[in-house]
């Protein structure tokens, strides 16, 4: 009998011989390299992906309003990849735009009114011949509505029907501050006068910006970035306090800004105002998509005060009040206030919706300001902490974001984590279905008779069923009964319908093997059925097991992706099929076009194709080595 050491040496020798043959196969090495790369990505996904794949949140444990569980979105919906800013053909910067309109007039109840028709709806050959009613069917706009955001109007020109061109003065047209895209004409022009508006607009790729570097005031140096002013500056002292800040986590520092009012002499005749300013540069020609402001404060010596959040344009000198909040707190506890650009009160205070279009019309220097307003009767102390402002841009991450609500997802993180589901489902389904097929094929081929007939007829029954429609029905039924479908349910279903072809192949090989002389000799020597199967039959069919394992994985990967794409996957896990499902349900294809957001769908499709092809290449390489009819003689 061979010793354990001899068996180990023989196994190592066989593996070395197999590896020497396998490494000579270029497609086999290429395929196994891809599988190793995807396996590495799947194993180390938490370290490679910058965000969780499901409901990623920004600021958890960083702001009082968010606490230790809630968070803000990591980015705006449908953000483009951040590397778009390096593409030379993507337009960026200030652009000069020209838009044309044509006028016509109508008299209603004795009053002459002027209307305009956009250039794209005006036909110089037919429109002038239309009646007033027919022109009204084209457009009844009484003002010029520009298609792009306006940073500055350059000129407004009128070309009369007789060919005379006149540049309108500032007194002959005007804009309402809350509607910068609309121009109202003063004079009434003859019908079919061509109005040309030349204006500047900014087009840019805007990154997320965190305005305040240290919003928790971890060190005293963080106060140096702030400046302050007051209408009673001689009674105000602004300092750093290292003990009375907010501690949401054990690792948090206790720093904060302390604002002290010293009552002295004559009481103030008007409310005391203290404004803290944090200067920053906004480098983009286009406004941010959204902004969010957070301030936490508490008071000692006064229970009622007001707090304002504002932006101040250092270049134009214009101040934009975002929100004013009254704070009434009998006990000296921190109270937080947050401001979101989507709030109606912000648009109302700024005078434009969305408010960021007016606040950040182009690049420039700004200040983020927080103002305390109070009526003191004695000494008062205020403490400010978690003071910050976030500006959301339109580019984010390596692959951008989707449009999931309320927490948009980082597509690169979803792609990385999706490799886990595809590999687990593909490999486990292949292993389970292959070994079930091996077991049933061995039993059917070697035992024969009624057992063979029952197994094969059952396999035939499953083979003739339409698999994908059946998968859909079974998955839907499981979801209806349990409320959700798990990854393990999908593996079970794919395994149940994936063993039949391999079982038939094993059966045919066993039927041939059991007629061989060495099997007859083993029977004559008194070998039991299990001994013959284990020692003589299985080693002769196991080469087919390796090949089937490799070639079965792609089918399972694609089927899982198909089910997830139809919305029948595990919604609690990120998968490549789920990425396709969310893209399909987003409506982006019809509203924006496939090519504009290719980065949402194409990487997942390419990943599925590459991983499936890698297993197929490995399967072909194994077939060349293990199949005697294809094996190269060297």
Q: What does each model-identified segment do?
A:
Residues 407-634:
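Alpha-helical transmembrane segments of integral membrane proteins
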Residues 1-141, 145-155, 159-429, 433, ...:
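Gly/Trp-centered helix-boundary motif
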């Amino acid at each position: 009998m061979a010793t354990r050491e001899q068996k180990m040496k023989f196994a190592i020798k066989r593996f070395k011989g197999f590896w020497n043959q396998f490494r000579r196969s270029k497609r086999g090495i290429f395929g196994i390299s891809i599988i190793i790369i995807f396996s590495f990505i799947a194993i180390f996904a938490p370290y490679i992906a910058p965000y969780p794949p499901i409901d990623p949140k920004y600021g958890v444990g960083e702001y009082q309003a968010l606490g230790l569980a809630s968070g803000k979105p990591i980015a705006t919906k449908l953000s483009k990849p951040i590397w778009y800013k390096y593409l030379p053909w993507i337009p960026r910067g200030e652009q000069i735009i020209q838009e044309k309109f044509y006028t016509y007039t109508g008299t209603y109840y004795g009053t002459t009114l002027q209307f305009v028709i956009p250039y794209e709806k005006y036909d110089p050959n037919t429109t002038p011949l239309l009646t007033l009613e027919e022109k009204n069917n084209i457009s009844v706009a009484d003002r010029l509505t520009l298609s792009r955001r306006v940073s500055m109007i350059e000129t407004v020109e009128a070309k009369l029907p007789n060919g005379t061109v006149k540049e309108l003065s500032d007194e002959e047209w005007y804009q309402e501050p809350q509607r910068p895209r609309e121009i109202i004409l003063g004079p009434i022009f003859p019908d079919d006068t061509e109005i040309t508006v030349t204006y500047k607009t900014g087009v840019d790729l805007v990154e997320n910006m965190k305005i305040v570097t240290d919003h928790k005031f971890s060190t005293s140096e963080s106060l140096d970035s702030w400046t302050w002013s007051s209408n009673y500056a001689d009674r105000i002292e602004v300092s750093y306090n290292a003990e009375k800040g907010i501690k949401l986590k054990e690792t948090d520092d206790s720093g904060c800004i302390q604002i002290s009012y010293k009552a002295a002499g004559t009481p103030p005749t008007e409310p005391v105002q203290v404004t803290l300013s944090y200067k920053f540069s906004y480098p983009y020609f286009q406004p941010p998509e959204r902004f969010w402001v957070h301030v936490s404060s508490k008071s000692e010596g006064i229970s009622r005060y007001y707090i304002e959040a504002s932006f101040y344009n250092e270049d134009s000198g214009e101040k934009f009040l975002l929100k004013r909040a009254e704070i009434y707190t009998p006990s000296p506890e921190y109270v937080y206030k947050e401001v979101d650009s989507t709030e109606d009160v912000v648009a109302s205070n700024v005078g434009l919706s969305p408010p960021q279009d007016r606040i950040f019309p182009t690049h420039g220097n700004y200040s983020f300001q927080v103002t305390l307003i109070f009526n003191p009767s004695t000494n008062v102390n205020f403490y400010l902490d978690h003071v910050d402002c976030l500006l959301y841009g339109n580019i984010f991450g390596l692959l951008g974001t989707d449009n999931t609500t309320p927490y948009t997802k980082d597509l690169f993180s979803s792609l990385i984590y999706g490799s886990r589901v595809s590999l687990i489902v593909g490999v486990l389904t292949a292993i389970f279905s292959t070994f079930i097929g091996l077991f049933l094929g061995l039993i059917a081929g070697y035992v024969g008779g009624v057992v063979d007939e029952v197994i094969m007829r059952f396999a035939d029954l499953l083979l003739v069923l339409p698999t994908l429609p059946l998968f859909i029905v079974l998955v839907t039924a499981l979801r209806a009964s349990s409320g959700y479908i798990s990854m393990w349910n999908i593996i079970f279903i794919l395994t149940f319908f994936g063993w039949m072809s391999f079982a038939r192949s094993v059966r045919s090989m066993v039927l041939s093997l059991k007629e061989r002389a060495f099997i007859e000799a083993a029977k004559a020597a008194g070998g039991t059925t299990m001994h013959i199967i284990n020692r003589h039959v299985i080693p002769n069919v196991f080469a087919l097991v390796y090949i089937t394992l490799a070639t079965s994985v792609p089918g399972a990967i694609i089927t899982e992706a198909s089910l997830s794409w139809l919305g029948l996957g595990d919604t609690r896990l990120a998968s490549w099929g789920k990425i396709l499902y969310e893209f399909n349900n987003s409506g982006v294809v019809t509203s924006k076009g496939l090519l504009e957001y290719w980065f949402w769908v194409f990487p997942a499709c390419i990943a599925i194709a590459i991983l499936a092809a890698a297993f197929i290449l490995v399967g072909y390489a194994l077939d060349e080595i293990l199949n005697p009819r294809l094996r190269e003689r060297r």
